[in-house]
């Protein structure tokens, strides 16, 4: 009986430690973020976690087209929301599958945290949108050079999460597992296909942020017609 009690105490202790470790220490959206450069043009998902609205059979030719529609205007201590138009698309079942599209809006409410947005279908009110954080972004050259601080706004890759990575997993932390409005973990690139070196360093960088990279699935981009 004492052995069983001791085992339960140990399990509870480990659970508490794991829970306390997520989100990882220092986990935050990117500082010094240039939203005008990031939310402009096409991004390609090269790895991501499957989510309810984009399951494994839709991880083909995934793209996100961004256009910044309004910028922040502040008057008398009140700021107008920044709005981003987002057009997502993916092929279903394979690179030659039918194209599935979704029109979304992104809203940035805090001009002092420009890398944190809320994203959702255009037909929904913004208070129902889910979190979207740009955790890090930079150039391929910076990444390949092994830098840990990324200062350029020549954004060629990005690590994105559905907000805080507050759910402990066997391999680290993930955002909002099981919560529709706070799901997702993506690796984005301006090119549909990247070198093995870029992929390895990008995955390693995401892991260094405390994210569970074992949850990432590859997104097929070779052979796609967008």
Regions found by a protein language model. Give the residues of each.
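A beta-rich soluble binding module of mature secreted/lumenal proteins
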Residues: 15-226
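Cleavable N-terminal signal peptides of Sec/SRP-targeted secreted and luminal proteins
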Residues: 2-19
């Amino acid at each position: 009986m004492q052995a069983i009690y001791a085992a339960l105490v140990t399990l509870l202790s480990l659970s508490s430690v794991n829970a306390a470790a997520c989100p990882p220490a220092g986990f935050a959206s990117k500082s010094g973020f240039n939203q005008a450069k990031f939310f402009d043009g096409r991004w390609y998902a090269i790895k991501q976690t499957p989510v309810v609205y984009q399951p494994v059979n839709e991880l083909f030719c995934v793209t996100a087209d961004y256009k910044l529609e309004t910028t922040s205007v502040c008057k008398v201590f009140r700021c107008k929301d920044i709005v981003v138009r987002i057009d997502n698309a993916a092929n279903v079942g394979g690179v030659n599958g039918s194209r599935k599209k979704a029109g979304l809006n992104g809203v940035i409410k805090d001009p002092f945290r420009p890398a944190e947005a809320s994203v959702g279908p255009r037909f929904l009110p913004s208070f129902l949108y889910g979190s979207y954080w740009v955790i890090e972004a930079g150039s391929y050259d910076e990444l390949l050079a092994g830098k840990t601080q990324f200062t350029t706004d020549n954004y060629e890759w990005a690590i994105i999460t559905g907000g805080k990575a507050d759910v402990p997993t066997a391999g680290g932390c993930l955002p909002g597992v099981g919560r529709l409005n706070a799901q997702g973990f993506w690796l984005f690139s301006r090119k549909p296909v990247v070198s093995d070196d870029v992929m390895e360093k990008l995955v390693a960088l995401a892991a260094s942020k405390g994210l569970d990279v074992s949850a990432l699935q590859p997104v097929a981009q070779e052979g796609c017609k967008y």
